[in-house]
Amino acid sequence: VPPGFTPFRQS
């Protein structure tokens, strides 16, 4: 997954 990506939030 890309840095800073979570399945819960993307900012």
Swiss-Prot record:
Disulfide bond sites: none
Subcellular location: Secreted
GO annotation terms (biological process): defense response; vasodilation
Tissues/organs with expression: Expressed by the skin glands.
Cellular-component GO terms for this entry: extracellular region
InterPro entries (UniProt xref): Bradykinin (IPR009608)
Primary location recorded for the protein, binned into one broad class: secreted
Domain of life: Eukaryota
GO MF annotations, alphabetized: hormone activity; toxin activity
Modified residues (4-hydroxyproline): P2
Keywords in alphabetical order: Amphibian defense peptide, G-protein coupled receptor impairing toxin, Hydroxylation, Secreted, Toxin, Vasoactive, Vasodilator
Homology family: Belongs to the bradykinin-related peptide family.
Role: May produce in vitro relaxation of rat arterial smooth muscle and constriction of intestinal smooth muscle. May target bradykinin receptors (BDKRB).
Name the UniProt record assigns to this protein: [Val1,Hyp2,Thr6]-bradykinyl-Gln,Ser
